[in-house]
Curated annotation (Swiss-Prot):
Belongs to the phosphoglycerate kinase family. The keyword ATP-binding applies. ATP binds at residues 198, 320, 346-349. It holds the Pfam family PGK. This is Phosphoglycerate kinase. Substrate binds at residues 21-23, 36, 59-62, 114, 147. The gene is pgk. One of its GO terms (molecular function) is ADP binding. Pathway: Carbohydrate degradation; glycolysis; pyruvate from D-glyceraldehyde 3-phosphate: step 2/5. GO terms for biological process: gluconeogenesis; glycolytic process. The keyword Glycoprotein does not apply. Its EC number is 2.7.2.3. Keywords: ATP-binding, Cytoplasm, Glycolysis, Kinase, Nucleotide-binding, Transferase. GO terms for cellular component: cytosol.
């Protein structure tokens, strides 16, 4: 992927506009998790350390375009960013009428981009208005890279220079390494409740990987495709044929979709449900599969330890309940111990990594939910395509 990087730009004496993803959650009016703000600090600090002034823009929540309500205000985000930087970060509400006059070292924030008319429709005039504020535009919002919007795509077309921020460049380099020229053997884990939501990812990865591990409700549908009885487990009967095709595709190239031979079942989906380990052939009609069994977990762990590239999206069991967390824990630890380059993404996956305390042992943890999935599907990400075009 050919794109310019912020860290290769001379920003001395320039105004840099950074599109960040600081869409943080709030609880009782306070920021409850500042991970996204902290993730954006590297680009802001690079600019400040190299003599630039910085304008940050982000979206927050899902406001109605053209309307402004108190809950849409980015002021708490600006205040938090200021606290982390040790600076006063002012919010600019009327930046179109009053273009800011900034000095090196200044940091300001534009009001929530999603209240601007034309933002979601990728309005070119709005993109030009953003671009008119800066000498250099930086996209550091990988989490929104799959959306063509004025603050991610149109602005990149119109700005004097458009480049990828530290976070964005890191994401793209890691994803490129994992998917464009992977070291082999390559293993992917795709898990979740439904095949339907991950079907295009499964099909796309089946072309690339040597082993395709499936988990959760997805694995149940594949077990059905193998003719196994799964009791009252969550599955999609209408996607059994698609599952058979994916298994045939993997087998034809000497790979496989290794399915569990033993499972952990319960009579109910509940935190206090009794967990029973069973051979896959012994699952009763009134039982549901909520995790893979210890034999299956050990076999899959061996596959992961022997891999050179691992792409991971989704836990293989209901890991929120400890009695059904064994499979996900075993695979998480195997990935952490493996010599493979590993990349993980998706909210549940990140929660599992945090729960089992291996955050520092995963090669790369992607910050983009939808963008990560669309990259796995092989789709073009509009905001990235815009950067690549400007990098030519």
């Amino acid at each position: 992927m050919a794109f310019l990087k912020l860290t290769e730009q001379n920003v001395q004496g320039k105004t840099v506009l950074i599109r960040a993803d600081m869409n943080v959650p709030f609880k009782d009016g306070k920021i409850s998790d500042d991970t996204r703000i902290r993730a954006s600090l590297a680009s802001v600090k690079y600019c400040l350390d190299n003599g630039a002034s910085v304008i940050v823009m982000t979206h927050l929540g899902r406001p109605t375009e053209g309307e402004f309500h108190p809950e849409d205000d980015v002021a708490p985000v600006a205040a938090h960013l200021g606290g982390l930087l040790g600076k006063d970060v002012k919010v600019l509400n009327d930046w179109r009428e009053n273009k800011p006059a900034l000095n090196a070292g200044d940091v300001v924030m534009l009001q929530n981009v999603r209240i601007n008319k034309g933002e979601k429709k990728n309005d070119l005039e709005l993109g030009k208005a953003y671009a008119s504020l800066c000498d250099v535009f930086v996209n550091d919002a990988f989490g929104t890279a799959h959306r063509a919007q004025a603050s991610t795509e149109a602005v990149a077309q119109a700005a004097p220079v458009a480049c990828a921020g530290v976070l964005m460049a890191g994401e793209l380099d890691a994803l490129g390494k994992a998917l464009k020229q992977p070291a082999r053997p390559m293993v992917a884990i795709v898990a979740g409740s439904k095949v339907s939501t991950k079907l295009t990812i499964l099909e796309s990865l089946a072309d690339k990987v040597d082993q395709l591990i499936v988990g959760g409700g997805i694995a149940n549908t594949f077990l059905l495709a193998e003719g196994k009885a799964i009791g009252k487990s969550l599955a999609e009967h209408d996607l059994v044929e698609e599952s058979k095709k994916i298994m045939a595709k993997m087998a034809a190239k000497g790979g496989s979709v290794p399915l569990p031979t033993d499972v952990v079942v319960a009579k109910a989906f509940a935190a206090d449900a009794e967990a029973v380990v069973k051979d896959i052939a012994d699952v009763a009609e009134d039982e549901m599969i909520l995790d893979i069994g210890p034999k299956s977990a050990a076999a899959l762990a061996d596959l992961l330890k022997a891999a050179d590239t691992v792409v991971w999206n989704g836990p293989v069991g209901v890991f929120e309940f400890d009695q059904f967390a064994g499979g996900t824990k075993a695979l998480t630890e195997a990935i952490a111990q493996s010599k493979a380059f590993s990349i993980a993404g998706g909210g549940d996956t990140l929660a599992a990594i945090a729960k089992f305390g291996v955050t520092d042992q995963i090669g790369y943890i992607s910050t983009g939910g939808g963008a990560f999935l669309e990259f796995l599907e092989g789709k073009e990400l509009p905001a990235v395509a815009a950067l690549e075009k400007r990098g030519e």
